[in-house]
Amino acid sequence: MVSSTINETLDGKHDINKVGQGETVCVTGASGFIGSWLIMRLLERGYTVRATVRDPDNTKKVQHLLDLPNAKTNLTLWKADLHEEGSFDAAVDGCTGVFHIATPMDFESKDPENEMIKPTINGMLDILKSCVKAKLRRVVFTSSGGTVNVEATQKPVYDETCWSALDFIRSVKMTGWMYFVSKILAEQAAWKYAAENNLEFISIIPPLVVGPFIMPSMPPSLITALSPITRTESHYTIIKQGQFVHLDDLCMSHIFLYENPKANGRYIASACAATIYDIAKMLREEYPEYNVPTKFKDYKEDMGQVQFSSKKLTDLGFEFKYGLKDMYTAAVESCRAKGLLPLSLEHHLCVFRVTLIFFK
């Protein structure tokens, strides 16, 4: 079940109305960080949810979905895989809408073109074909901030008209480059297909997603977000001049845009911006036991923030409920509760030393 820590974090933030009763929607990538939380919110709102996963019989990876409130009556698991053409047909048929979140995530891939990029594009088009066959109302796609601002020189502000520079990404090959390429090409292919097939398609562009979570393992985005605590230096570049959104705000923006008849096109869903120094300062104040660094090599302390404009989304009536501190404290507490983060840097080093001694 959803932990009391999570419930306390969310109390009184987003109002939940039973507007989805009688409506069936499909969520791809259901067992993941965003998918599982979105399903929780959809169930609370009265929707019947078809959740696609690669292996519905893998209890370890799906039990957190089955334990959600209202899951017994309003949630079913469906086997589907981005690598298998037509595998989403059955899950989508009979739905009024689809939330497409599933995406391959393997930053260590030895063959990113065939293991991440092509499956993301082909999987996107295959799902849209299923949607056209089913004659459903609307598709909401979870894109990425990496489709917007990855280029040689950062602008002060980015909006939905911006696209990242593919040639730059492929040449530099920074951390996560294959994910950025896959999301850019998949979204661009989706816009073309949707226009040609008169399919109502909306993309949501989240920056780094931070917050509490239901899934049992560490979400990839939190590996990045919490890198100042864990000293994962290869991820520092992503939060050097970062943008952030709370997981709950992001999921509620998905539902908001699905339900709003005026919604169309791309929408950035970013609550705030911060530099790695802003994050480090906040973490030192909230969690001094982690001894978060005060200096970061190659990064100037006075570098400016880079903003993602969510004006299009807020002008439509959406309101962000959480700030940076809310996101990070909820993420840290969830990680601690699941044993995914040490209680202090000293504890982490002790475990590390014991491990070294054991393996000598």
Swiss-Prot record:
Entry-linked Gene3D superfamilies: NAD(P)-binding Rossmann-like Domain (3.40.50.720)
Pfam family of the protein (one): Epimerase
Protein name (Swiss-Prot/TrEMBL): Dihydroflavonol 4-reductase
GO molecular function: dihydrokaempferol 4-reductase activity; flavanone 4-reductase activity
Keyword terms: Flavonoid biosynthesis, NADP, Oxidoreductase
Role noted for this protein: Bifunctional enzyme involved in flavonoid metabolism.
BP GO annotations: anthocyanin-containing compound biosynthetic process
Enzyme nomenclature, EC number: 1.1.1.219, 1.1.1.234
Catalytic activity entry: a (2R,3S,4S)-leucoanthocyanidin + NADP(+) = a (2R,3R)-dihydroflavonol + NADPH + H(+); (2S)-flavan-4-ol + NADP(+) = (2S)-flavanone + NADPH + H(+)
Pathway listed: Pigment biosynthesis; anthocyanin biosynthesis
SUPFAM superfamilies, alphabetized: NAD(P)-binding Rossmann-fold domains
Organism in which the protein naturally occurs: Dianthus caryophyllus
Family: Belongs to the NAD(P)-dependent epimerase/dehydratase family. Dihydroflavonol-4-reductase subfamily.
Binding site for NADP(+): K61, Y179
CDD domains tied to this protein: FR_SDR_e
Domain of life: Eukaryota
